[in-house]
UniProtKB/Swiss-Prot annotation:
Organism of provenance: Arabidopsis thaliana (Mouse-ear cress)
Annotated family: Belongs to the small GTPase superfamily. Rho family.
Propeptide: 195-197
Location of Cysteine methyl ester modifications: 194
PANTHER family on file: RHO FAMILY GTPASE
Protein name per Swiss-Prot or TrEMBL: Rac-like GTP-binding protein ARAC11
Catalytic activity: GTP + H2O = GDP + phosphate + H(+)
Lineage of the organism: Eukaryota, Viridiplantae, Streptophyta, Embryophyta, Tracheophyta
Residues holding GTP: 13-20, 60-64, 118-121
Keywords for the protein's UniProt record, in alphabetical order: Cytoplasm, GTP-binding, Hydrolase, Lipoprotein, Membrane, Methylation, Nucleotide-binding, Prenylation
Gene Ontology biological-process annotations: establishment of vesicle localization; pollen tube growth; regulation of actin filament depolymerization; regulation of actin filament polymerization; regulation of exocytosis; small GTPase-mediated signal transduction
Signal peptide segment: none
Xref: PROSITE patterns: RHO (PS51420)
Enzyme class: hydrolase
Motif Effector region mapped to chain: 35-43
Length: 197
């Protein structure tokens, strides 16, 4: 059996979208109830996906503006990014294309991205929207549209609180690294119209 491949997976996204909760939920099967900005240490574990053993290294980042200059230091050597937004925060959804995609393209061009909508349990929670009248839910269709717009191979909605699709997020991230999606070859207009006389 061959040695396991190391995969560095870095989570990014706005502050308070649930990046740390997602990581804690995945690594310990528990849900932290108090919000403390980025207290997750880097984590490494052997994971088997599609019969391949992978040493998965998880890196948490702080989404707050205060960390804009420090955060990119953790991008070096990343194999895949988990780009998270909250399904109950339109601002975090909009920042995927406004802030995060430009940052990732600048500091880590070509690294694949798994787009993740977090807090799935709250999207259908009527009481949450009564208590937070300004909150706007993001639909699955909107998430898929954003995935296409940013060119991410995968979009997954999950809930760290209920564990729904949490494992699927990290399995998808590993799969994207082990089996990158085939690039569609586009012929430029110049190639199509060129004729030699």
């Amino acid at each position: 059996m061959s040695a396991s491949r190391f995969v560095k997976c870095v989570t990014v996204g706005d502050g308070a979208v649930g990046k740390t909760c997602l990581l804690i939920s995945y690594t310990s099967n528990t849900f932290p109830t108090d919000y403390v900005p980025t207290v997750f240490d880097n984590f490494s574990a052997n994971v088997v996906v599609n019969g391949s053993t992978v040493n998965l290294g998880l890196w948490d980042t702080a989404g707050q503006e205060d960390y804009n200059r420090l955060r990119p230091l953790s991008y070096r050597g990343a194999d895949v990014f988990i780009l998270a937004f909250s399904l109950i925060s339109k601002a975090s959804y909009e920042n995927v294309s406004k802030k995060w995609i430009p940052e990732l393209k600048h500091y880590a061009p070509g690294v694949p991205i798994v787009l993740v909508g977090t807090k799935l349990d709250l999207r259908d929670d009527k009481q949450f929207f009564i208590d937070h009248p300004g909150a706007v839910p993001i639909t699955t269709a909107q998430g898929e549209e954003l995935r296409k717009q940013i060119g991410a191979p995968t979009y997954i909605e999950c809930s760290s609180k209920t564990q729904e699709n949490v494992k699927a997020v990290f399995d998808a991230a590993i799969r994207v690294v082990l089996q990158p999606p085939k690039q569609k070859k586009k012929k430029s207009k110049a190639q199509k119209a060129c004729s030699i006389l």
